[in-house]
Amino acid sequence: MRQVKLLLIFLALIFAGCSTLAQRSSTGVVVARRAQIRSSTAVVAADLLQVNRGDVVDILESTDVPDPNDNTRKERWLRVKAHDEDTTEGWIEARNVMLDDVLEAAKKLAAEDANVTAQASGQLRASSNLRLTADRSGNDNIMMRLDSGSTFDIISWKRVPKPKSSESIETDVAPKAGSAQPGARSSNRQGDEPNEPEETNELWYKVRLPPEISPAPAGWIYGKQVELAVPSDIIFYRTGREFVAWQRLDGDPKDNNSSTEKDGGRESKPGSWLILEKSSSNQPHSLDEPDFDRIYVLGYDKRSQEHYTAYRSPDLTGYLPAKVEGRGDDKSFVLRLQDESGAMKDTQYSLYKDARGVLKVNAPNVAPRERRRK
């Protein structure tokens, strides 16, 4: 009788395991530029099939195996079935695959700003994580690691409280399974460095990515890893303030700031631009500080092949997104500005050309902003 009970318990465990395995079965997409499906998780396993970024695989099961370099840590592996002619089955490191539910979450994130034109373009200074949320206090929201030099469109940005666990860590690179976390920089700085107010908040960019860079169409990137890719046509017109957003005023607004080309759109043909500027400050950044504090419209004379200042606003308080509307010479742009009462208002600026073909801006009355002292 006892043997029968043990057999029943054993069978129940088997069926429970099969049920769990079936529930976890799903699909995933390869995020690594290239990866190998292997015969096993062993170091000496054979390579069965090379898969590339964007390839879809069926996930059959997962397991954690000791890292060969550190037995105190484990690496997660997935047993997958490829969609090749031979339907190859084998094992692949989990970090090389994005699960389908994560990809769906990224698509929903992209849908939130589907009608928003890119506000700027950026490029990674170093390899960095692409996350579902603007939070680097843990690894659960990491979708994939982007390569250094990856380019993307910037849709928006925000500041969030800096995690206490990363007060001294100024990067966002999740370690490969089995490796140590990036070491924190020493907090005992040299006495000859000036004492600056400590930043309690950190900047994050919401980005839109082309398929060749990431299967996930959108995500969040830690701001210190990002270099703004200011177009070569306007980069030399900065006058003490940073260019934080820009859009072309000639051509189709939908074509603005495409980062699918190398160097994130740095090279661009001459033209007219809407540029949003922001003053620099040595004071800590607040969570609700404005995105920009001045509007700069740069015109372009095709005959002389020279740029000129069509409009420069007084100091103001503005927030993204900026939207360019219309076609041809009948265009305008809309910005979210704060009025004298502190209320937010969508403000429209009309564009026109005078008899000589010079670009002009019909600017509404906008409340000037009190400049913050540096």
Predicted regions and their residues:
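Bacterial N-terminal signal peptides that target proteins for export
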Residues: 1-8
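C-terminal motif of bacterial Sec signal peptides marking the signal peptidase cleavage site
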Residues: 15-17
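Boundary regions of SH3-family modules and the immediately adjacent low-complexity/disordered segments
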Residues: 19-28, 32, 36, 70-123, ...
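Short, structured beta-strand/loop micro-motifs enriched in basic residues and often containing a Trp
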Residues: 32-42, 125-137
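Short alpha-helical segments in extracytoplasmic peptidoglycan/chitin-binding modules
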Residues: 37, 51-54, 60, 79-80, ...
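Conserved beta-strand/loop element in small beta-rich adapter and peptidoglycan-binding domains
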Residues: 46-71, 138-199
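Short beta-strand elements that form the blades of beta-propeller/WD-repeat-like
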Residues: 271-288, 330-340
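Hydrophilic extracytoplasmic domains
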Residues: 305-374
